[in-house]
Amino acid sequence: MKNYKGYLIDLDGTMYLGTDEIDGAAQFIDYLNNHQIPHLYVTNNSTKTPEEVTQKLKEMNIDAKPEEVVTSALATANYISDEKSDATVYMLGGNGLRTALTEAGLTVKDDENVDYVAIGLDENVTYEKLAVATLAVRKGARFISTNPDVSIPKERGFLPGNGAITSVVSVSTGQAPQFIGKPEPVIMDIALDILKLDKSDVAMVGDLYDTDIMSGINVGVDTIHVQTGVTTYEELKEKDQQPTYSFKDLNVAISELEKNAQK
């Protein structure tokens, strides 16, 4: 395995599995920290703030800082702010998205007379919220969605994800949204801009082929698949585009890096 100068790292299925630690995850981050190798956590989760994400990582014995976290909510706020710094936004979503939008200097409104509609995972979604979002898009608001995941793994099983909620507005208006999160290039380009490294020196690490691995492939960075989450090695072998590497877990990645260091 190549020694990269920076890493973009997925969370659920890579750093932890729900509320369980994944063997090798904390050790991999310790290795990066000890060797002063920059890395960012890139997540499609829009409900949490970077501080909340960091707190969960610390509970998993992973040493992380809020400034190392790029959520789809942060990327969405960044994207809108770059297009129109004084934009008004109608949003569906949680505290993570609302905080990101307001901290970016954007105005969150509760009616359909807005510049943008931003949809993130909203566990308290109602018909009225979807109705206002639909009316706003029909009136010409730019239609943004934090991430396309149609289902999310929870303790009860796979539940509707943000892509499922977004599809209601999309089907009703006949308009496709601009998705921000993985596997779209938007969130990856923002993360790469923060790292300020050549793409050839960066690897994307993740478990889920359709989001994590494809996000790396879509922006032209190497990819490291870990067999600790959703996509199994057997499923991976059936894919047309293969990751650069696939490891049983991140302990194997550490061993590979240590071998290179001894050469």
From Swiss-Prot:
Role played: Catalyzes the dephosphorylation of 2-6 carbon acid sugars in vitro.
Reported cofactor(s): Mg(2+)
Family per record: Belongs to the HAD-like hydrolase superfamily. NagD family.
Keyword field: Hydrolase, Magnesium, Metal-binding
Stored CDD domains: HAD_Pase_UmpH-like (cd07530)
InterPro entries: HAD-like_sf, HAD-SF_hydro_IIA, HAD-SF_hydro_IIA_hyp1, HAD_sf
Enzyme class: hydrolase
Gene Ontology molecular function, alphabetical: metal ion binding; phosphatase activity
Pfam families: Hydrolase_6, Hydrolase_like
Organism, scientific name: Staphylococcus haemolyticus (strain JCSC1435)
GO cellular component assignments: cytoplasm
Name this protein carries in UniProt: Acid sugar phosphatase
EC number(s) given by UniProt: 3.1.3.-
Keyword set includes Cell inner membrane: no
